[in-house]
Amino acid sequence: SFAECMADALPLRETAARVGVSLYTAWFMRMRVCEVMALRTPDCRPGTFHVDGTLVMGSLKGNLGRSGILGLPRPRHRNGRDGRRASRGRSKEWVVVECGVNELGDCFCDVCGRGSAGAGELSVELAARIPAGSAVVTDGHKSYGFAARGYRHAEVDARDPSSGDINMVNALHSRLKAFLRRFNGVSTRRLQRYLDWFRYAEAFKGGGMDGRERLFMHEAEGRYWKTRRLTHLECGDAMVYWTRQIADMSTVV
């Protein structure tokens, strides 16, 4: 069944062949199930959260014409290598994924801007994901001093082991990158859906129920809000940069 394919994180072509549907239908079913996963993942419980961001290379893969985005606002990348070579550091072509995890295993992973997340973006993110009364442990990035002001906040210095560590979130980053590598690149405008999928898998990985059975139950009971048309028009904050680039190119021409 499709739930089994999603639980095993199979590629789209293999999923379509196993379920007996077209590649497009398999893709849309995946988007629908990701929507259910986002709604079914429990909120984080209070605790001590290790928080840090990681960078994911921006990707324009997919049928951009369906969303009204015409043309590429940059030279085409070959296997992702050209983009990494030309966009080292905190380039706007990198998407910030802000992550946090506590000692209970509760975690969050959300798109949080491009290049480098600002204090305002981080404040909104932490307030939305971390319950009141929790403690937050971060690195020395100055934006966290403002963003975590509503929590008990501790900073660690990577050069001083005695100041503590943020190993829990570093391990979460590794698992997230391994998860995304299965798909050979994820479109930036769909990235949050895949982050929701990863968070769902993390939330239920230690449960007694079989993951396939649980996902099938959640699919059957879930509600879907996005139609096919709305899914194609989905853009997301991380794509605003590219739409502006395209607009600027059109103005120059």
Each PLM stretch: what is its role?
Residues 1-253:
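Residue-level recognition of single "structural anchor" positions
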